[in-house]
UniProtKB/Swiss-Prot annotation:
GO terms for molecular function: lipid-A-disaccharide synthase activity; phospholipid binding. Keywords: Glycosyltransferase, Lipid A biosynthesis, Lipid biosynthesis, Lipid metabolism, Transferase. GO terms for cellular component: membrane. Residues 226-626 are annotated as: Lipid-A-disaccharide synthase. This is Lipid-A-disaccharide synthase. HAMAP family: LpxB. The keyword Lipid metabolism applies. Condensation of UDP-2,3-diacylglucosamine and 2,3-diacylglucosamine-1-phosphate to form lipid A disaccharide, a precursor of lipid A, a phosphorylated glycolipid that anchors the lipopolysaccharide to the outer membrane of the cell.
Amino acid sequence: MLPLYLVHVLYPIGLIANLFFGSAFTIQWLLSEKRKTAYVPKAFWVLSSIGAVMMIAHGFIQSQFPMALLHGANLVIYFRNLNIASSYKLSLTTTLVILVLTLLVTTLPFALAAYYYPYMEWMASPNFFHLPLPPPNIYWHIVGCLGLFTFSSRFFIQWCYLEMNNHSTLPALFWQAGFVGGFLAFIYFIRTGDPVNILSYGCGLLPSLANLRIIYKKSRLPKFHSPSCFLSAGEPSGDTLGSDLLRNIKELNPNIHCFGVGGPLMRKEGLEPLIRMEEFQVSGFLEVFCAVFSLYKKYRKLYKAILKENPETVFCIDFPDFHFFLIRKLRKCGYRGKIIHYVCPSIWAWRPNRKKILEKHLDTLLLILPFEKEIFKDSPLKTIYLGHPLVKTIANFQDCNAWKQQLEISDQPSVALFPGSRPGDIFRNLQVQARAFRSSSLAKSHQLLVSSCNPKYDKKILELLDKEGCHNNKIVPSKFRYQLMRDCDCALAKCGTIVLEAALNQTPTIVTCLLRPFDTFLAKYIFKIFIPAYSLPNIITGSVIFPEFIGGKHDFSPEEVAAAIDILANPIGKEKQKYACQQLLKTMTENVITPKECLQAIYAQKNRFYLKNDFIKEFHPKSSRA
């Protein structure tokens, strides 16, 4: 279609196009090797699209109609893979129309050229180096056509997988068709003396072989020991979540073997403990640093046990830093089962890069806070909002009217203190809270009731209160904390889950959190954690429900906390907080998925054998024979 000298001058366009194809497959191969599984990054489709446009131009210039037609069709498929994950996803019908139009536009110039130039070849053999090659016979052309057809069919195979699964991937059949078709085309272009296509199809054999090798190695991994699942919770709050999750799993399959890390609640539900949760009780940067070798030994024990048992599902509940190491190690070692993380790390507060780790390694993320769904709205990671378990716990809580009589506490009005659950937190925060109470207007009219998580700390708590001049006081065991919240006039609580419990019990509350000097330094100057609010009620509502006093000893004083107590002594301030707590509850109970529905979503389709038959029928009516 073009003058011969121009055809030769523009011939390198095909070579440049193959550099883009080569780069696309090289990136795909390297990332697949790193992840130990066939993986397709977005860059693969972008680079392939650029290469396809250049190969279409190369086909026009060199009068190679099949080449232009093939890459025209492939260009539409590349576009579809990029489009399917976007917010402007086109329908399948629209995509098919684009494909037909592309093929027509590609064919039209060749048809016009053939009409005006009857001797034009539709598949010219360039023989760029002028080798003394005789024209290939019909059998060579059959080999070439068969190779090109098989090779080109791989992206149509991929397209079918894409539309069926709504997910961009390159299945094993894609690589098998690519290898067989590429090998036949490679032989054919050697015979015709076409260096661009020799390079293209010759180099194209390498990614196919590399990915088939990865797929073969993956298929040789041991099968799942089913039914079994691993659960890990390193904190008391995680133990509560894990016990509820474990109860639902056991209801669906009573014979499932559940093992891992858990506290007394999870062990009560049938967890076989590899390590007890109590062995993970560390808090703050300094305590974690001192326990790093012990944590490393536990980490090694756990990932080795998981790889040996090979459960189908791994549930990591909260405790993100430890679990992230475990999750990455499992994927690196080729673990193929589902990994679900229960409770999103506070990426909205600090270290937002952890979102990429979640997207890379997890199958599902279970959320307990309503605003977290918005964070992942454009993410490929599947998220399920279960709601916060405290909502249900507090709603079902039955008051014990005689709790004061049991503890020999008078009916005098009270202020409640919740200094924390760990020893370091308790004594740092209790001192600030006691001084604030003593400086407030309620000190003479109210008694001081302190919630204690562990009886072994009670003696030291009473000694500290006496030292601070708070003599009208009593210790209240943690199991009575909800009665305490509902009975007291106001509460001072250490920043944490206890603040959300207070809000759901509609308790007027002030948040305090006195940090160690070292933790304060790291938070301010190393990790630079500066957010509008730190307690969950304030974060969820986006407003200041509870006043917050958080930081080092120079960031706030007991007198400032006392001023906040005096505001809550006013009925107007108290009612304002209670109304805000009611709105918080409404926000937290919208669009919640039940645990049973959650497990159905996790174990959908290929994992149906995990569930009891009645559950299969309930959620998979077409598969009742499974």
